[in-house]
Amino acid sequence: MAENPGLENHRIKSFKNKGRDVETMRRHRNEVTVELRKNKRDEHLLKKRNVPQEESLEDSDVDADFKAQNVTLEAILQNATSDNPVVQLSAVQAARKLLSSDRNPPIDDLIKSGILPILVKCLERDDNPSLQFEAAWALTNIASGTSAQTQAVVQSNAVPLFLRLLHSPHQNVCEQAVWALGNIIGDGPQCRDYVISLGVVKPLLSFINPSIPITFLRNVTWVIVNLCRNKDPPPPMETVQEILPALCVLIYHTDINILVDTVWALSYLTDGGNEQIQMVIDSGVVPFLVPLLSHQEVKVQTAALRAVGNIVTGTDEQTQVVLNCDVLSHFPNLLSHPKEKINKEAVWFLSNITAGNQQQVQAVIDAGLIPMIIHQLAKGDFGTQKEAAWAISNLTISGRKDQVEYLVQQNVIPPFCNLLSVKDSQVVQVVLDGLKNILIMAGDEASTIAEIIEECGGLEKIEVLQQHENEDIYKLAFEIIDQYFSGDDIDEDPSLIPEATQGGTYNFDPTANLQTKEFNF
């Protein structure tokens, strides 16, 4: 998991305050937001896309001479300014093919050759749509490169001409202009806002109609995703307001690529703070978003989980909107999903519900999800265990005594204590805080809790943590031992000793505590 030390420190400090506000308990993904996305290689998730080489009717015999010889950049450059339209088109096609045919197209060589102004000039040629198309394609591929290469296209004043081409009567020219603008917008918030300021949104959204070919609509949706990306700064509020109605239409689409992109767009918007979350809620899309958590396509589930997960980082009221859509009924399947990253995101979602009010905590309990969270705490990969630790600790702060008592009855303490020996000091502190909260809430039953902690090896781990280099951790460890373990030795209850297995792990009997202990916090 990507770390943000400043934020984590702030979060940890807040964590120690029993009455801390929900804003500090709820956790945004920060750098982690890209983790699932980066592991995907699906084209629809890329910020920029190169248009691949395709032999088509566009590639007529006019470029036969160029195919027959190894054309130099100098020749391309010279012929691209020819007065002979056939020669000029062949040269621009040759440039486009250089940019389309190779895994590492010679973008910098072409930029250095001085061809950019020539290609941009070709965009003006309304009398020759084939030339406009080829030039737009070449510029699209240049803009698909590095940020510096994209900036070279922007600085050549291509953007106003691409916007003009959105009104071309030739659909292939329109579509190529859309693709080029998508690459430029995908470069970052500065380019995004520049293209928005020139008026891209209205003509772009006008393409969303029943007659548009599916490939064109996929491109339009991908550009909408890029308009919604980036939150430093987020897109202008007016732009979000313009885009949301389109997303509310596209979320019904049966094409998987369009659906996935639509949901990712919503996830980016909900990652932009509570005001943008509210705009998404007000659009009415949430009831249509939640059922996608059980979509048969993992790509759709992943995007939907991120989008609803971002919404529940908002206020209790915003969280309740999602809960009111029966969202928790989807979580047994998500928590037992074969993909670990889905498990992790699902537990992250639930950690933000257990950071809510007591009714929201109860909803998680009533949905039967606590045992599944505890299973992930014990058996999940480390990233998932970390999220589960937050979910449990948040519950010890937000929950009522009976809710925390239920947590203990589900045998949360042994797997919780196991995390005290990990190297991640953030996790260690979250667990210590959770244990301390449980002990405090147990009141007269604290000795029973202390006994469970000792029997599962937790006390030994806490004793070691008194030597921890982190001041907050060693102080907390000392406080717990001083307040709850400094008296007479607790009589050992043999029924609580875990059975050792091969490999040095332990099998904890989940019924042992219930048989031998009565919890009345």
Curated annotation (Swiss-Prot):
Subunit relationships: Forms a complex with importin subunit beta-1. Interacts with DDX21. Interacts with NCBP1, NCBP2/CBP20 and NCBP3. Interacts with RCC1. Interacts with ZC3H11A.
Domain IBB: 2-58
Basic and acidic residues bias (residue ranges): 18-29
Residue list for modification Phosphotyrosine: 484
Classification of source organism: Eukaryota, Metazoa, Chordata, Craniata, Vertebrata
Subcellular location, principal: cytoplasm
Annotated segments matching region NLS binding site (minor): 306-394
Protein name: Importin subunit alpha-4
